[in-house]
Amino acid sequence: MAAEEGQVIGCHTNDVWTVQLDKAKESNKLIVIDFTASWCPPCRMIAPIFNDLAKKFMSSAIFFKVDVDELQSVAKEFGVEAMPTFVFIKAGEVVDKLVGANKEDLQAKIVKHTGVTTA
């Protein structure tokens, strides 16, 4: 279930999540996780922007989408309490978190942690 370059990797089972996260960690790229829910209007609003950012930063980051209702244990592991929540992982460690559907803040954090200002 690997995504093509520049695509968001949707994880719908714990097994897929574990395999894909391990692969992403091996890449040494920034990992950006969008914790979302199908019933969340701000999540639906930010989804196309998140997809665009995945294309823009494909050489320096890997993007995941996790539905909190499908993978409750993963959401709990990362302390997700509101949606959308974006978690940023670098070198296997959580380095940042953003709660809310703010396009500018999301892009700014990706730039900050990748060091890439333009794609």
Swiss-Prot record:
Keywords: Cytoplasm, Disulfide bond, Electron transport, Redox-active center, Transport. The keyword Cell division does not apply. Pfam families: Thioredoxin. Residues 2-115 form the Thioredoxin domain. GO terms for molecular function: oxidoreductase activity, acting on a sulfur group of donors, disulfide as acceptor; protein-disulfide reductase activity. InterPro entries: Thioredoxin, Thioredoxin-like_sf, Thioredoxin_CS, Thioredoxin_domain, Thioredoxin_H-type-like. GO terms for cellular component: cytosol. Disulfide bonds join 40-43. It is found in: Cytoplasm. The keyword Glycoprotein does not apply. SUPFAM superfamilies: Thioredoxin-like (SSF52833). The active site is at residues 40, 43. It comes from the Eukaryota. Thiol-disulfide oxidoreductase probably involved in the redox regulation of a number of cytosolic enzymes. Possesses insulin disulfide bonds reducing activity. Belongs to the thioredoxin family. Plant H-type subfamily. This is Thioredoxin H4. It comes from Arabidopsis thaliana.
